[in-house]
Amino acid sequence: MRTAFLALGLVLALASPAVAEPLERSAGQTVYVPVYSHIWHGNLDAEQKPRQLLLSSMLSIRNTDPKASMTVSSVRYYDTNGRLLRDFLQKPMELGPMASTDMFVEHKDDAGGTGANFLVEWKAAGPISEPIVETVNAYFFGPQSLAFTSQGRALPAGTK
C-alpha cells in the first residue's frame, strides 16, 4: 500500500504543471551566459583525447516587460580563457516592450571552446521585469541532432 501511495505521489508530481518563478525587477544588469562552441563526447582515442562535436550557438535576449523598453548596451563574447573574441554591438540597441533580439555563433567557429561565454549588459529608465537571456546550443546534421539551452545569470552589481 505504501508503494502505491509513493507511486501515485510521483505520478502527480511529474504530471502537475511546473510553476514559473516570478521575474525580479531591475533597472540594469550584467548577465553571464554560458556558450558551448563545442563539446567533448565518445571514448578516448589513442592520444587519450575524446572526440569534439562542434555546435552553433544563438544568444537570445528577451525583454519580458509588457510596458517598458530596455537598452542592451554591450554583448561581448569570450573564450574559455576569458579572452575577448568579439564585441557583437557597435552601438546600444533598444528593445521595446516584449521585443527580442539574438546573436549567432556559427557551427564552424570553435574559437570559444567549451568554456566560452557572453557578457550582456542592459539598462532601463527604471525597474522593469528582468529579461530572459539564454543561449540555444545546437547540432543538426542528417538524422542526428542535439540542442540544449544555457541560462544567463545576473552578476553582482558593479561587475563588468
How should these model regions be labeled?
Residues 47-58, 116:
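Short, solvent-exposed loop/turn segments enriched in Ser/Thr/Gly
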Residues 79-117:
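Intrinsically disordered, low-complexity Pro/Gly/Ser/Thr-rich segments with frequent PxxP/GP/PP motifs
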Residues 61-68:
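Asparagine-centered strand-capping/turn motif at beta-strand->loop junctions
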Residues 1-4:
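Positively charged n-region of N-terminal signal peptides that target proteins for export
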Residues 109-160:
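Terminal connector regions
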Residues 7-15:
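Bacterial N-terminal signal peptides
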Residues 16-21:
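Sec/Tat signal peptide C-region and signal peptidase I cleavage site
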Residues 68-75, 87-88, 130-134:
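Short, hydrophobic/aromatic beta-strand segments
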